[in-house]
Swiss-Prot record:
This is 1-deoxy-D-xylulose-5-phosphate synthase. The lineage of its organism: Bacteria, Pseudomonadati, Pseudomonadota, Gammaproteobacteria, Lysobacterales. Mg(2+) binds at D151, N182. The gene is dxs. Catalyzes the acyloin condensation reaction between C atoms 2 and 3 of pyruvate and glyceraldehyde 3-phosphate to yield 1-deoxy-D-xylulose-5-phosphate (DXP). It comes from the Bacteria. One of its GO terms (cellular component) is cytosol. Its EC number is 2.2.1.7. NCBIfam families: dxs (TIGR00204), PRK05444.2-2 (NF003933). InterPro entries: Dxylulose-5-P_synthase, THDP-binding, Transketo_C/PFOR_II, Transketolase-like_Pyr-bd, Transketolase_BS, Transketolase_C, Transketolase_CS. Keywords: Isoprene biosynthesis, Magnesium, Metal-binding, Thiamine biosynthesis, Thiamine pyrophosphate, Transferase. One of its GO terms (molecular function) is thiamine pyrophosphate binding. It comes from Xanthomonas oryzae pv. oryzae (strain KACC10331 / KXO85).
Amino acid sequence: MIDTTRYPRLSRIHTPDDLRRFDEAELTVIAEELRSYLIESVGKSGGHFAAGLGVIELTVALHYLYQTPVDQLVWDVGHQTYPHKILTGRRDQIHTVKQKDGVAPFPKREESVYDTFGVGHSSTSISAALGMAIAAQRNGDDRKVVAVIGDGAMTAGMVYEALNHAGGMDPEPNLLVILNDNRMSISEAVGGLTKMLGRASGSRTLNAIREGGKKILGDKKNNPTARFVRRWEEHWKGMFVPSTLFEEMGFHYTGPIDGHDLPRLVGALKTLQTLKGPQLLHVITTKGKGYELAEGDQIGYHAVSPFDPSKGLVAKGGAKKPTYTDVFSDWVCDMAAAEPKLLVITPAMREGSGLVRFSKEYPQRYFDVAIAEQHAVTLAAGMATQGAKPVVAIYSTFLQRGYDQLVHDVAVQQLDVLFAIDRGGVVGPDGATHAGNLDLSFLRCVPHMVVMAPADEAECRQMLSTGMQYQGPAAVRYPRGTGPGAALDSSLATLPIGKAQLRHSGTRIALLGFGATVDAAEAVGRDLGLTVVNMRFVKPLDKAMLLELAKTHEGFVTIEDNVVAGGAGSGVSELLNAEAITLPMLHLGLPDSFQHHASREDLLAEAGIDQAGIRTAVLKRWPQLMTGKTPSLNAAAG
C-alpha cells in the first residue's frame, strides 16, 4: 500500500475524478509526488522507466482537464504510460508490472476503461484516435479525443497517412494530437524530421526574443501583458519552426512549449479545448526528467531491472554469458571485415539489435532509418539490386510491419537480403504486442525464402554466415536472451542448406526440434530412447532425412516456439502428405492465441514446450513408451 505520509495527495487519488477535486494550484505538488512514486515503484519492480518520468506533468494535466474516460486519451507505443496507470486505479498494483497476472506494461483495453486502445508498436495513436473521433461524431457524442505521440514515433509513415486524412476531413474531427518531443525513441531519434523539430526548440531568434521578454516582464508571469506575449510567441514560432508542415496538413499548430511547466501546459490545453477542428500541441520534454541518472543515460534507463534508486543501475560482476543478440553483434562485425559489400539496416533499434559496436566501427555501412520498417526492407532491396549484401537487423514483432515489402520487394525479385530476426518465439514480460510467435508461419509460406532457426549460439553464427552466402532472401530467427552455452569462435563457417542434424539415434518415435526447443527435446529423447533431430531449417526441410525416418519410426513429434497453425510442424505434415505417407503426428508449439505478459519460462511451460511439457505430451500420446521405465521416470512424467 502507498505511504500516506510520503504521498499525502497521491494516496487520495484512486481515479481521475479524485485528481479533479484538487485545486489547480496543487497540481505541481501532485506531479512531484507522482514522479517520486514512479521512481520508487519501478525501482522495486523494474520496467519502462525514463519515458514515464518525461510525461509526469503532461499526464497530470490531461487527466485533470479532460473528463476521462468519457474523453479519450490514446497513448502511442505505451512505454510512457505508467503514470497514467497510477492515476487510473492501478497505483497499488503498479509494482506487479510485467509479471504474470500483474499490470500490463502497455495500455490494454481489457485491463482498464481508461486504456482506450491497446498499443506496443509505434505510430498507431493518431490513426486510432481519429477513428474514435469519427465514431463519436457520427454518434453525436461531444467527447474529446487526444493522441499523445513522441517525436521518435513521428518518423513512421502511417503517422502522415493519419495526419493527411484528419486534416482534410469535412466535417472536421474533434481531435488533439500532442507531440511529445524528447529527441528520443528507444535509441536516439534520427532523420530529417528530428532535425527539424530540434530547430523548433533551438531557434536563436526565438530564444533571444523569449529571453528579452523575461527581462522586461520579470516574474510577472500572469499579468495581461505576459499572457499576450506568450500567445504572440506561439504564433511567432511559426516563422521559424515546423508549424508550416502541420498547418499545411490542416492542423492548427501550437508550440513548442515546455512540457514540464505545468501551469503553462494547463493553460495551453484549456485554450485548445475551446477550439474546433484538428489541433496539434508541440511540447518539449526530457526523457528521465527528475531522476538525474536517467536524464544522463536515457537509453540505459529506458527499461530497467529492479534497482536501488539511491545508487542507480549497477553493472553485474563476473563473466557474462552471451545472448543471441551478442552473438549477432560479434558476427556482423567479423563478417563486415571479410565482406566489404555487407551493409546493415535497423529501424531505430541500434541497442536492442546489438549494433552499437558495428555503428562505431563501420559508420558508413550502418543505416538507422528510424521507426520505418517498410522503408528499411525496401531500402535493403534497392541496395541488393546494386550488388550490396544488406542485413536487416529487426525484431520479429516489428518485421510484421514490413511484411508486404519482404514479399513484394525482396522475395518476388529473389534479392540477396539477409534478415537477422531477434526476439523470435516466446519473448516474455512485454506481452502480446512484442511476441515473436508468428514469424515461422508467415516466413515459410514466402517463395524463395530460406528460413533458419538455431539451436545454440554457435549454430546462430553459422546460419548468419549461411544466409550471407545464399543467393536470395534468407532469414535467421533467434530468441531473446541466452542459449545453452555452446562454444563460440570467430570463424565464418556455413551450413549446407536444408540439412538437419541427428542429435540422438533412438527408436519408435522421432522428436523433430526447431530452434530454441531442441535442447529440451534432446533431454526427453535421450531419457525415453527416442530419436532426436535438430531440424535447423524451417524451409527448406531436410526431405531426405524425414523420408528415411518415416520408414523406421512409428510417429513424429514436431516441437517449435511458434504457433502450431502454419508453422514448422505444418511443413513436415505437408511434406509427408505430398509423398503419400501416413504417419501419426504430434505438433507441439504455441497455442492459437496471443501471449500474455509473464516470464519466458512460464510461457514455455504453459505451452507445454519445455522439457516437462514435451515429456508429458509424448507419453500421453504414446503411453507404451513407459514400458520398462523406472518408477522415478514414471513419476517425472506426471
